[in-house]
């Protein structure tokens, strides 16, 4: 079993399958990778992309593959029939109709929050930026509870002691996916205004995705990312492609979209603005950890230099 979970996907394989092309039992996907400033394009099976070897392995649980099993069971499984049902409903519905139920939002919010929390960028940010701040405060609090004589002798040793990086990563995963915390993050999204975009340019300019597919933007800001914009910020917009032809955008009810929440929440909107589609695609590629994914027929056009 452990061998089966050596190549640990940082984005669900079943999610990537929707952006690829079936080839027998495999699904082939177009890949863009930037290595030391050099851009390379290739095709490969979705089994072989979007993963990091042993990335989620832990030492604080009986099963070192605990998190990979958790993601496969609790999160990635949602990319199967649940996602299929949502996409089918959107595809078969008329424009301007309500296509997302409360259950659909629950499913998608779990996928989005888990994706935001499991990517290396989020884990590394917590380790390198947030953890040092918390660590310093925890040490100060600890020192304040100790006898003065002990502090005088050992203060420098206490303040210089750090948890190993592996422990820090385990701390991040345990905190992010603790049920009460995870449910609270999901509720923030569920309470937002959900707009379902049907891409009218799917055949020539489909939605792209990457191994970091959830785009968190701030209205009026150029920086992207969860920690630069915040999950509950009224100016935050979350954009998530479900397939080459369908994406959801989530806006805060406390922001400017709140005024039209009843009109747009859960509604299918035909998206004909090529500039908007290309902008989202560019940002999703730019924030990729390693791999961006380009559906057909756009992949062949890019590879051949015709676009």
Residue ranges and their predicted role:
Residues 1-7, 11-307:
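Alpha-helical structural context detector biased toward long hydrophobic helices
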